[in-house]
Amino acid sequence: MDGSFVQHSVRVLQELNKQREKGQYCDATLDVGGLVFKAHWSVLACCSHFFQSLYGDGSGGSVVLPAGFAEIFGLLLDFFYTGHLALTSGNRDQVLLAARELRVPEAVELCQSFKPKTSVGQAAGGQSGLGPPASQNVNSHVKEPAGLEEEEVSRTLGLVPRDQEPRGSHSPQRPQLHSPAQSEGPSSLCGKLKQALKPCPLEDKKPEDCKVPPRPLEAEGAQLQGGSNEWEVVVQVEDDGDGDYMSEPEAVLTRRKSNVIRKPCAAEPALSAGSLAAEPAENRKGTAVPVECPTCHKKFLSKYYLKVHNRKHTGEKPFECPKCGKCYFRKENLLEHEARNCMNRSEQVFTCSVCQETFRRRMELRVHMVSHTGEMPYKCSSCSQQFMQKKDLQSHMIKLHGAPKPHACPTCAKCFLSRTELQLHEAFKHRGEKLFVCEECGHRASSRNGLQMHIKAKHRNERPHVCEFCSHAFTQKANLNMHLRTHTGEKPFQCHLCGKTFRTQASLDKHNRTHTGERPFSCEFCEQRFTEKGPLLRHVASRHQEGRPHFCQICGKTFKAVEQLRVHVRRHKGVRKFECTECGYKFTRQAHLRRHMEIHDRVENYNPRQRKLRNLIIEDEKMVVVALQPPAELEVGSAEVIVESLAQGGLASQLPGQRLCAEESFTGPGVLEPSLIITAAVPEDCDT
C-alpha cells in the first residue's frame, strides 16, 4: 500500500476526531448514564457490529446505553477514532464487557491480550500468584491471554502481533477432570476457561453452572445499575416518541436487539464484583411480559417507558431547559437539546444580503426579502395570491380552489391536512379511543389540544380572548376568530362547484354532501341515512328509543332528545337568541324564527301582539276583523267589514249558517255610511 494513502487515512480520522470533539457534523447522540457523547454514525458502524446492525434501517437518532458504561465508554469512543485503547488493571474487565456488548472485536482482542505488570518473583512462582483470580479467569475468553504489559496497551491495533505470547505459555489443553489439584498451571487454567465456555446441555443447565443475563424486556429502564448488564436501545424521533413502544413494523429491530444482548451459556464478567450473584432469582429466569398502557393499549419494554408514555396522555412535560425554558417529555430529549447549546442558537442572527439588515429569525428575513424582490416564494397557480410558507399555499388551494387534502382516511375516505390529524381521526372516530385524560376530573379528549382547552376552561377558568363586539370570551384565539365572522359576515370557505361561501370548513363539508348525495350517517335500527350526525341522534331518540330519558331539573318535564332539553332550559334562563330582524321578536329555536318570518312575507305591519290573529288574512288597511262574538256585543265602525277567512278551529264547524245583509240602512248612531257586513249566528254556549 502506498505510504501517502496511509497518511491520508490517518489524517481523515484525525479530522473526524476533531469534529467529534467540537460536535460538528455529528449525526449520532449516545446517552450513557446521563453523559451525552456525540459521534458519527459511519465511524460507529465501521468499528462496532452492534451500531452497524442498529443503523441497518437507515434511520439515525439517539442511543441510550447503560449507566455502567459511563466510566469506560469514552475510552472505547477514543479507540474508534484513534486506535488507542488505554487499559489498566482496574478498567480492563469493564472495557471487555462493553466491547463484547457492543461487538467490537478489535477491542475484545486487546482486552484479552492485556496482562497487568507483575514482579519477577510472581512471574516465576508456582501456585502462589499465577494469573488473575479465579473469578476473573472464569470470565475470560477462549483464547489464552498473551503477555502484553500494562504500559504497552496504548498502541494501535495494527502494531500488536498476534503470535507474541509469553515464554511460559502453551496451547490450551483439555482439562483433566480427575485431577483438580493441577488447576493452578497456565495450561490447565486455559483448559478450565474452555470448559467453562462450552455450551451447557439443556438438561444439565443449573443457575450455578450457567448464568444467563436477563433479556432487556426485564429492564426497568429508570436508572440501570452498574452491576447489571441489562440495557435498552431507544431510537429517538423528532416528536418525543414513546421510547420502547413495540409495534409490528419494529419486530425486525427487536430481533436485532435480542440477538445483540443474548449471549452463550457462560459466566460473563459483571460490571461490579458479585453483582450477578446478588441479582434476584426472578430476574434470571424466563422473560418478562411487556407492560401495556391501560389507555391506548400500547406495549412497552419497561415500566419506565410506560411512565414516560403516560405523560403524552396528561400533557405533562417535567423536564425544562434552564436557559430557554423549553419543556420535554423525557430527560433524554432535554439532554440532547442542551447538547445543541440552545443559547447559541437563540443568539444566531440572519443578515440580509442586499441591505445587511440583521434579524433574529429566518422567517423575519424572508418577510424582509419581499421588500426587495416584490414576490413571495409560493404563488397560487389559480389566482394571484402569494404566500410565505408552503403550508399556507396548500391550505389556500384546499379552501378556495377545491384541491384535495393530502391525507385520506382508508376507512371513511375523509381527508386531512396533516398525518397527525389523520391518526387522531382514526383513533377517535373508528376505534373509539380518547387517548388524552385529565388528571383532575378524568375527562377524556381525542387530542392534546382538546385536553388543554378543557383544563383552561373548566379547572383554571382561563378565557383570555374576548370579542370586541359582544365581550364573549374564549379559551383559544382560533375560536374567537371563528366567532368574529358572525359579526363581520366573513365567509372564507367557498364551494368550488356552486360558489356558495360558508363561515366554517364543517359547514362547507356538509354543503358538499348536497352535491355528492352522500349520507354518511346511517341508522343502526332502520335503513334511513342522514347527512349530519345531529339529525341521526334525534331520529334514534324519537323513533327507536322508548321513554323520555331526558328531564328538566327545574320543572321536571321530560324529553326524548337531549337537544330538546337544551332548548327547553333556555326558556328557564330567558335565553332567546334568535331575533326577528323585522319586528324584534325573539325565539328560542331557529325553526320557530323561520316559521315566524313567513308571516312577514304575507302580512305587512305585523305586530307581535296580534299573533292570535295570524290565521286571518287582511287585504286592506280599511278592513278590520270581526271576532266571533255574540251578536249583542258586536260593534260596527265606519268602514267596510269583510271577513276573508275565519279562524280554523272547532268553532267554525259549529256555525249553523250565515246571513248576508246588503244595501240595508242602519239608524244606529254608530253607523255613518252604508256597509257590507257579514254576520254569523253564534251558539249561546260559546264563550269565545
Swiss-Prot record:
One of its GO terms (cellular component) is nucleus. One of its GO terms (biological process) is telomere maintenance via telomere lengthening. Zn(2+) 1 binds at C293, C296, H309, H313. It comes from Homo sapiens (Human). Zn(2+) 5 binds at C552, C555, H568, H596. It holds the Pfam family zf-C2H2. It comes from the Eukaryota. Residues 170-186 have a biased composition (Polar residues). Zn(2+) 6 binds at C580, C583, H596, H600. This is Zinc finger and BTB domain-containing protein 48. Zn(2+) 2 binds at C321, C324, H337, C342. The modification Phosphoserine is found at S169, S171, S179. Detected in adrenal gland and neuroblastoma.
